[in-house]
Amino acid sequence: MIVSTLEHILTHISLSIVSILITIELRIFLDDEIKKLYDSSERGMLITFLCITGLLANNWIYLGHFPLSDLSESLIFLSWSFALIHSIGYFTKNLKFLSTITSQSTLFTQGFATSGILTKIQKSSILIPALKSEWLIMHVSLMILGYAALLCGSLLSVALMVITVRNDGKFFFKSNNFLFREISYQNKNFFYAINYYKTQLIKELDFWSYQVISLGFIFLTIGILSGAVWANEAWGSYWSWDPKETWAFITWIVFAIYLHTRININLQSTNSAIVASLGFIIIWICYFGVNLVGLGLHSYGSFPSTSN
């Protein structure tokens, strides 16, 4: 009873704080002068991170195993991963765009994980035999940490593409009229300042997208390898082309291509951002879409069947 009440309190506190922080983050993103508001937002996100950490610890004690055995539990861990990335970014300057992404990602995943949609698959304290292994924590946690980092990096790439497309647009209407030419001349410095700011923002988005995706790719690679070892112990085969395994491999290939485009100077920035944006969709198919189908060896984490 106490454990259940504590879980309820921690869940709603974390969800409420993040909901408030989203409004603050969006306001801060548009105004560089709100220092106190920014500090309050960061402290609030740290509190959210601690609440979700407490929620995971509470569930671990209640269930008797680390809470990563179904979709609901993995979503909570995913929201914790977003909050962790946000907390790391707190100690790095000029990362407000990353904070905006991670705070909203935390809200959506935490909100969905604790919603009534997943009620039927929550609180299953009995593990299937394949999950009763020390590999559970290592494999699943690394995969979800990898997904979280790759999703954040991909969203930075999406933002980069949007800004790049708008930056390439024409700010002036071509006209031979003297009045329009005069206005264009007077506002030239203003538009140069805007373009300079956008150029610097694009460079920062490109740099941090690459850094975050590289980190996520490392987690994903180790997660897949550890999963292969675990699969051999549990099912007698390192790889069985299970739907989840197949899409995890596709995800790995997509982001391997992304890293290749980063090595090739001619394919950097916009081209690599396109690949990362595609990867954003692929990750959700791998993580969430396969669970909707509920087929294969990983179907224990899927939605429950509605038919009896």
Curated annotation (Swiss-Prot):
Pfam name, any one: Cytochrom_C_asm
Name the InterPro entries on file.
Cyt_c_assembly, Cyt_c_biogenesis_CcsA, Cyt_c_biogenesis_CcsA/CcmC
**What sections of the protein cross the membrane?**
2-22, 44-64, 71-91, 143-163, 212-232, 247-267, 273-293
Say yes or no: keyword Zinc-finger present: no
Keyword Ion transport among record annotations: no
Q: Name the Gene Ontology biological process terms.
A: cytochrome complex assembly
Location in or out of the cell: Plastid membrane
| Key words, A-Z | Cytochrome c-type biogenesis, Membrane, Plastid, Transmembrane, Transmembrane helix
**Lineage top rank: taxon:** Eukaryota
GO terms (molecular function) for this protein are: heme binding
GO CC annotation terms, alphabetical:
plasma membrane; plastid membrane; thylakoid membrane
Q: How does it sit in the membrane?
A: Multi-pass membrane protein
Family designation: Belongs to the CcmF/CycK/Ccl1/NrfE/CcsA family.
According to its UniProt entry, what is the function of this protein?
Required during biogenesis of c-type cytochromes (cytochrome c6 and cytochrome f) at the step of heme attachment.
Q: Output the PANTHER family linked to this UniProt entry.
A: CYTOCHROME B_B6 PROTEIN-RELATED (PTHR30071:SF1), HEME EXPORTER PROTEIN C (PTHR30071)
Which proteins does it associate with, and in what oligomeric form?
A: May interact with Ccs1.
Name of the featured protein: Cytochrome c biogenesis protein CcsA
Gene name linked to the record: ccsA
